[in-house]
Amino acid sequence: MFIPVTNICRNRCGYCGFRREPGQPGARLMKPAEVISILKNGVRAGCTEVLFTFGEYAEEMPGYNLMLDEIGYSSTLDYLLFLCETAIETGILPHTNAGVMTRSELEALKPLNASMGLMLESTASLEAHKDCPGKIPERRLETIREAGKLQIPYTSGLLIGIGESREDRIESLEAITSLHREYGHIQEVIIQNFAPKPGTPMESFPEPTVEEMMDAVVLARHVLPSDVSVQVAPNLIDPKALIGKGVTDLGGISPLTIDWINPEAEWPDVRDLQKKLGDIPLRERLPVYPQYVKRGWYSERIGSLIERLSDNEGYRKQPAIENAEDLEK
């Protein structure tokens, strides 16, 4: 499940249609009851993971703290900790992506998350990120580094087609590789294609071609260590041709919630996706990859839930296809 807790954000990315400021139409901070309702429906639908996303450091935006006060919290971190606890109690494993974070914030969240993530996007200084204090590459790399020091299973990724060069992509992949070789915590790297959004500064910017995406996937598979998966989003690009180039993971597919970052792109049905892939088998995993399940890279707080949901290989006990069929019974 994809739960966008708030879309209020200090960054002003040139391609983002998700961000709002307090007082703007569509600006929101989800109330606890809203989140709890989605979590309960998720359990009934057979979900195992909730992705909590946030605009980055919304507290820096005037008016946001009043919204927090209205739901009884003094900080976004305190609210997020409550939501993670609630998800675990409901039977869902949290995965948090809230932008750049300090070591102390990561330490607080580690026991309550199966994994966490932050898109590097690019090591290049880009026009798309000119008004984005959280998109300074060194700051993002530092967050990823601190997660490694804390042994948090981690997701990162590149955003393809936002003004970076092929050499920038290689440099970005090498930066992620360097951190993984030092700490061993990168589960997967997402190779995500830019998709223009109406009303944004980059609404007329060209999308990357399929050939560009193929090349980016090939680069990722060549540069990244073999134990790091390469992922693409099947709601943004047809994955079949990319699997032959090195893609090994298709990310999360929600039966309940939309992709709030790319709301125009519907999730594929799991069974339709399997038909499209033909003899390429799908196997469902948890938000923590099998190798990290086997290593015990999780806290006591979520240990019993991971053990209940995982098989002896570290994957999910019941395949996704069976779950989809069960929902119709």
Swiss-Prot record:
Residues 1-235 form the Radical SAM core domain. Its EC number is 4.3.1.32. PROSITE patterns: RADICAL_SAM (PS51918). InterPro entries: Aldolase_TIM, CofG_family, Elp3/MiaA/NifB-like_rSAM, F420, rSAM. GO terms for molecular function: 4 iron, 4 sulfur cluster binding; 7,8-didemethyl-8-hydroxy-5-deazariboflavin synthase activity; iron ion binding; transferase activity, transferring alkyl or aryl (other than methyl) groups. [4Fe-4S] cluster binds at C9, C13, C16. Gene3D superfamilies: Aldolase class I. The keyword Iron applies. Its cofactor is [4Fe-4S] cluster. Pathway: Cofactor biosynthesis; coenzyme F0 biosynthesis. Signal peptide: none annotated. It catalyses: 5-amino-5-(4-hydroxybenzyl)-6-(D-ribitylimino)-5,6-dihydrouracil + S-adenosyl-L-methionine = 7,8-didemethyl-8-hydroxy-5-deazariboflavin + 5'-deoxyadenosine + L-methionine + NH4(+) + H(+). Binds 1 [4Fe-4S] cluster. The cluster is coordinated with 3 cysteines and an exchangeable S-adenosyl-L-methionine. The keyword Metal-binding applies. Keywords: 4Fe-4S, Iron, Iron-sulfur, Lyase, Metal-binding, S-adenosyl-L-methionine. Consists of two subunits, CofG and CofH. Belongs to the radical SAM superfamily. CofG family. Catalyzes the radical-mediated synthesis of 7,8-didemethyl-8-hydroxy-5-deazariboflavin from 5-amino-5-(4-hydroxybenzyl)-6-(D-ribitylimino)-5,6-dihydrouracil. This is 7,8-didemethyl-8-hydroxy-5-deazariboflavin synthase.
